[in-house]
């Protein structure tokens, strides 16, 4: 497998360090060669495109220039970073008037981490190296609303009903539960300004997941993980309900299946303690 650049984005340096630790474990155990993109910068996330259209393209655009200089495809763990890099790619490639300061050739691929790790050959490598079964886990797969939309930008084929996470976890033995809210919005950054809105959106996700028989939720987006994990106790109090639905990154599920020994290093960062579920499933 050729070496690829990883664009970690800001959150993997802070609030989503558990995501980074689990993905680094997975890539190491699968012999996937990742090298952090040198001198990367913030993509602008939700702030830049609400303030300055040019800045919203040039911030991620600079990272694409760096990636082309490195000559390696780019893997992006963060759903929003991936979206912004794809937007920048599209805008810069059609910028014939020289509106933006950066130029790219489109010579490197930009891949969402989930897409990258759910390739058939990579999944087969996981299955070949699997140490622990996930048969007692019944997750719903929650993709969120950003990574696949708009499809004209992301190139997603099944943007309303993605299945790559479902198939990956099924190959590792998990009893994946189908549900209709795979790509519904969790409220994202509105958790600060409109917690009532986020609470209502996330409550709907909890209730449907439980009604479908799930015992956990698996995500590929840091913002989704934060809203579903960080606020679960508060949402329960707000609606007078007692929820227990551990929320995992899909990379944590892979790491568990591969028999990672330092799982406590990242699982301890969860607000909803996954230990009772993992203990009962023989995974701790």
Where are each of the predicted segments found?
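Iron-sulfur cluster-binding electron-transfer modules in prokaryotic oxidoreductases
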Residues: 1-284
């Amino acid at each position: 497998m050729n070496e690829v650049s990883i664009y970690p984005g800001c959150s993997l340096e802070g609030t989503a360090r558990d995501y980074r630790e689990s993905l680094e474990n997975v890539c190491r155990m699968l012999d996937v060669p990742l090298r952090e993109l040198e001198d990367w910068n913030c993509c602008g996330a939700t702030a830049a495109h609400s303030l300055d259209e040019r800045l919203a393209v040039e911030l991620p655009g600079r990272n694409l220039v760096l990636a082309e200089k490195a000559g390696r495809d780019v893997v992006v763990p963060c759903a929003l970073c991936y979206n912004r890099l794809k937007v920048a790619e599209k805008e810069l490639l059609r910028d014939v008037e020289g509106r933006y300061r950066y130029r790219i050739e489109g010579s490197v691929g930009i891949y969402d981490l989930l897409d990258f790790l759910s390739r058939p050959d990579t999944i087969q490598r996981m299955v070949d190296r699997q140490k622990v079964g996930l048969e007692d886990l019944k997750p719903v797969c929650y993709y969120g609303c950003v990574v696949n939309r708009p499809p004209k930008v992301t190139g997603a084929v099944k943007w309303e009903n993605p299945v790559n996470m479902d198939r990956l976890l099924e190959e590792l033995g998990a009893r994946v539960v189908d549900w209709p809210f795979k790509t519904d919005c969790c409220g994202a950054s509105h958790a600060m300004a409109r917690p009532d809105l986020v609470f209502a959106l996330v409550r709907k996700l909890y209730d449907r997941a439980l009604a479908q028989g799930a015992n956990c939720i698996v995500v590929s987006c840091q913002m989704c993980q934060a809203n579903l994990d960080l606020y679960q106790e508060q949402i329960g109090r707000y609606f007078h309900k007692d929820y227990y639905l551990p929320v995992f990154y899909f990379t944590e599920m892979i790491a568990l299946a591969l028999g990672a020994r330092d799982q406590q290093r990242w699982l301890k960062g969860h607000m909803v303690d996954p230990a009772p579920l993992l203990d009962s499933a023989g995974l701790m």
